[in-house]
Design a protein with these regions (language model features):
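Conserved N-terminal segment of class I S-adenosyl-L-methionine
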Residues: 1-161, 171-174, 240-241, 266-277
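Short glycine/proline- and charge-enriched loop/turn segments
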Residues: 62-70, 203-211, 252-258
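Hydrophobic/aromatic residues located in beta-strands of well-ordered beta-sheets
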Residues: 120, 187-189
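Short N-terminal helix/helix-N-cap motif within the alpha/beta-hydrolase-1
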Residues: 168-172, 199
Length: 278
């Protein structure tokens, strides 16, 4: 029997089983052949799925994440999400600033924010995405630890959307970002919530979709706050945002499958009110 390895975030060896079963390997309906175990750290509260060696720059990895490594497909999937992200930051907080997007993909957010910023930096290992970023005059580097020292302490705002859950060492990842931020600089970080309420309502059907071979880590608000504090950041503030709308949630409950945004029309007669709480 393999010995328990210390948590890579907090070093604790206190672990329990968070989930055991099939996990998603690619798109909906594609599952791992073998049952997988997601562990819950008793020290920091993070969930952890032991991963295999990963080449983040490979086309095969992008196929598992989004089904394609083509910039055009990335834009089609993600352009519609960017306005809400910009609203969360506020355009005034970006004007004449140095903005760094870590794990930026083909650059949907950077493209939107570029008109406000003094400099935009994209951190992205995928070659096809790097080429698209360079064509749009973003500064491009594959990883934070490969950014030249000239940028150390020069970044005003860093963002990283749905990236940290993919990594083997999230603590080192955040420390690398912090090295590049100026004193008082800000980081906006997003990740799926491991306390997603659909896991309560559909513990079997939704769990095998929620847990993924490409997601090594699973955080709730408390675990994420502990992580950023350990990385040296101060005053973490957590808010909850539903990435997909009410229609997607309702159709999950009815059909037990994802449907995306705006599939079900919830307006109309009856005077119904749908309370929606984070």
């Amino acid at each position: 029997m393999a010995s328990i390895q210390p948590c890579k975030i907090c070093g604790s060896v206190e672990q329990s089983v968070l989930y055991r079963g099939p996990v998603r390997s690619g798109r909906f309906g594609q599952s791992s052949i073998n049952l997988q175990t997601v562990w819950l750290c008793g020290g920091c509260g993070a969930g952890y799925l032991p991963s295999q060696a990963v080449d983040y720059a490979s086309a095969e990895y992008r196929m598992l994440v989004d089904g394609s490594d083509a910039p055009e497909d990335f834009y089609r999937l993600h352009d519609g999400e960017q306005v809400e992200k910009l609203r969360m930051l506020g355009t005034g907080s970006l004007r004449d600033m140095v903005l760094m997007d870590v794990g930026c993909g083909a650059g949907s957010f950077l493209d939107l924010a570029k008109g406000f910023c003094k400099t935009t930096i994209g951190i992205e290992p995928t070659p096809s995405f790097q080429e698209a970023l360079a064509k749009k005059k973003h500064e491009v580097f594959p990883y934070c630890h490969e950014v030249p020292d000239v940028w150390e302490g020069q970044v005003d705002v860093a963002v990283s959307f749905s990236v940290i859950e993919h990594l083997e060492d999230p603590l080192a990842f955040l420390k690398d970002i912090r090295r590049l931020l100026r004193p008082g600089g800000r980081l906006l970080l997003s990740t799926p919530n491991r306390k997603d309420w659909l896991l309560e309502f559909l513990p079997d059907d939704y769990a095998r979709f929620f847990y993924r071979t490409v997601h090594t880590w699973y955080f709730d608000a408390e675990a994420l706050s502990k992580l950023v504090l350990l990385a040296g950041f101060a005053d973490p503030a957590v808010s909850h945002l539903h990435r997909y709308d009410l229609s997607n949630a309702l159709l999950w409950l009815r059909d037990k499958r994802p449907t995306g945004l705006g599939t079900l029309k919830t307006g109309g007669g009856g005077g119904c009110i749908f309370p929606w709480h984070a």
